[in-house]
Structure formats: structure tokens, C-alpha cells
């Protein structure tokens, strides 16, 4: 009976405030406030402790649902992007999920972490991002996992642009070199290139950036194909070079036809806009992450 009267003494206002702060249930908030003798800070700590205990049981359950979240600094010089996974698409569409993802992306652009672990060990306003994610797990009731993180920096004369496609299924960042102040044509070009990358998933920025092993493997395949056609060696070599050029146009960003204007390559479109594409990042939800 005593416990019931103690719970009754906790004001509805405090319970409501604690619920808004923590996302915990009404009775959990009442009990925590009672245990903390009405101290809101201590009650929050009690719920956090209990929430973390619940959250720990969910570790490893995040799947391929979630969102890609990107952010660009106010000066346009840095971009950050993360893939945050959840167990269900329902949770991935909540404001709480978006809030956590935005914090992670903002930290990525500000600190350029080289790994997920480095990102989660960062502190923002006195709170480790790892703890922020864990608290979100407790509040939302299912596991979250930061799958990968990236950072992109603009050249001294230039900026970073971002684009999120299909509600967070794909995210892109593009670094553009352009004269300052940046002209509208360069801004429009950056946006178009971001969307282009989302659609085409290029393997590299330029030929020089393609992994040698990938080019060598393609050359071997093309050599075998050309040789099987019984052509003279000098013709075979020309066929290989021609087919390699076609391969580069399919996988190299600067050589691809711009989706919005296929008659122009991305490189040519950038040149006409008085800009140059110098880097990009692309995340697609659930795809195999590079080691």
C-alpha cells in the first residue's frame, strides 16, 4: 500500500516531462521518479540504466532496414554521411531515428572519423555518440547499428553537395571545384551529378582511380572474347581497346553520359558549368560495404 501512495505523490506534470525526455512508459517514469524522490535528473539516470540493460539484449539484431543520412557544413566545405540500420522500416521512418542519424552525420562532417568505432567514440556536448545510440535503442525498442561512415572535403575553391534518394535508400556526396563566389550553374551541376551518381553507381571518378585488378580482369575477358572471333592480332588489339573504352564509359563517373543530358559526359557538363568534379561518395542501404 505504501508503494501505491508514494507513486500517487508524483505529479502528473513531472511524469509527462520525464516521458517526453526519455520516451519511457508512464508507469516506468512514475517508478523512477518515486525511487529518485522526485529528482528528475536522477530519475532519468535510473531509466537510462534500465534502458541500457534492455538495449544490451538487442545488440546484433539490426538488419538491412534503416536510412542513409547525409549532412553538409554551413560553409559547404565538408560533407558527412552514415548508414544507420534498424530492425524494421517503421522505426527507420520515425523522427527519433532521423534525429540520431543527423547527429551522426553532423559528427562525421565535423571530425572526419576513419571508422564507425572512431565515430561512436566521439563526444558531442559531453555525450558519447555510442551512448546516444544506445539510449535511442532503449527508447525505440529495437536495435540500431551504424554500418558505415564517410567524409568528403571540398577543395580550397569549391564546395560539397549532397543528395538523398528514395527516403534514405541511397545517399551521395559530391566535391566540386569552382570559382568563389559559386555561380548558380555550378550549384545546379553539383545537384545533377549527385542525382546521377545515385542512379548509375559509378565505380570511380576517373580511369586512374579504377583498381588495377578490375581493369586487368576486364582486359582478360575482352581479350578472350576478341581472340575467339578469329581476328588478326592487330585487329584483336584494336577491338580490345575499343571495348575497354566502352567499359570505362560505363563505370567511370567523368566519362559517363549525364543522366539528365546523355549527349554530354559528366566531365563535359562540369566544364560547361565552370566547375570540376573532384570526388564523390555513394551509399546504398544494405549493399555490401567496402572493407
Predicted regions mapped to residue ranges:
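N-terminal assembly/interaction segments in proteins that build large macromolecular machines
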Residues: 2-291
